[in-house]
Amino acid sequence: MGCQKEENAKEVVDYRNAIWTGHEQIKKDGFISTNTLVKIQGTIEHNRAGIRKLPGTELKNSVTGKTIYTPPQDEKEIRNYLKNLEDFINNNDDGIDPLIKVCLIHYQFESIHPFYDGNGRTGRILNILYLVLNNLIDSPILYLSKYINKTKQEYYKLFNEVRENNNFEDWILYILKGIEITSKET
């Protein structure tokens, strides 16, 4: 039991350190890059593995073991998707409201699933940094992890709805609800 508490505390500290690493990077650069995401993930996971180079990554239902989603497998393809995402994130002339855009960014990042591990935490930090970068929050303190973890079944259902049926509306409403609930709790 004590080891589990220590491990949980270590994970929280790593998450906090990753947020501040990313925050410092975007304040210095004025934008979010693939390199920023690699630094965040490396801080979370204490490794330098970087972008996935080997195929075989699948997202599985933790109860049934059934494959829910297979992200891109080829490193070059992953890097191309990340470059497109980076361009989308940093294009402020597209006319998309930043709150809507953060929902789309989250979906795209999780779909790319560029790392061997730490994608969920990195994606949630990306949300926070995007909101800071666009002056929607002053400090990186809006943690969607609790909301997403509490509603994980709905999260994956809506994630698949976008992928299979291009239903972004329910996904966007879900993420916005999470932002609203989390904002009130913060």
Positions of predicted regions on the chain:
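FIC/Doc superfamily catalytic core
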Residues: 1-186
